[in-house]
Amino acid sequence: MKISVGNDIVENARIRDLLEKHGDRFLKRIFSESEREYCSNRKDPVPHLSGRFCVKEAFIKAIEPKVVLDMREIELFGKEFGKKELVLHGKSKELFLTKGYNGCSVSISHAENYSTAVVVLYKE
């Protein structure tokens, strides 16, 4: 079995600043419609946006750090306290399949000031 690991951490204030400065333009550039909807229904959407941002960055680091991918093609789904699942589209999915990966695990955490994520890609 071969695995590839990516991780990321972001200061929640950084995402809050981007959201205040660029608003919908920032959201629509990074997050899918379903991700935006999920986060907007939270008391404070910023930690949830930050965590999803980290997942996208961690996926890119795990699959190919030098490649440019549309972050909206990397979607995080799952219950609030349940198992998370990545759903890939377009070039992200194509790259995942081309490299022969057949599985992915995601871990995401939030704290008051930071959000972090780890993505593990694997092929058997």
Swiss-Prot record:
Keywords: Cytoplasm, Fatty acid biosynthesis, Fatty acid metabolism, Lipid biosynthesis, Lipid metabolism, Magnesium, Metal-binding, Transferase
InterPro entries with a match to the protein in the record: 4-PPantetheinyl_Trfase_dom, 4-PPantetheinyl_Trfase_dom_sf, ACPS, Ppantetheine-prot_Trfase_dom
Names of the cofactor(s): Mg(2+)
Ligand binding (Mg(2+)): D8, E57
Record-level GO cellular component terms: cytoplasm
Transmembrane segments: none
Protein EC: 2.7.8.7
Enzyme class: transferase
GO annotation terms (biological process): fatty acid biosynthetic process
Catalytic activity: apo-[ACP] + CoA = holo-[ACP] + adenosine 3',5'-bisphosphate + H(+)
Broad class of where this protein is predominantly found: cytoplasm
Locations listed in the record: Cytoplasm
GO molecular function annotation: holo-[acyl-carrier-protein] synthase activity; magnesium ion binding
Described purpose of this protein according to its UniProt entry: Transfers the 4'-phosphopantetheine moiety from coenzyme A to a Ser of acyl-carrier-protein.
Alphabetized NCBIfam families for the sequence: acpS, pantethn_trn
HAMAP family according to UniProt: AcpS
Protein family according to the UniProt entry: Belongs to the P-Pant transferase superfamily. AcpS family.
Protein name: Holo-[acyl-carrier-protein] synthase
Organism lineage string: Bacteria, Pseudomonadati, Spirochaetota, Spirochaetia, Leptospirales
Gene name linked to the record: acpS
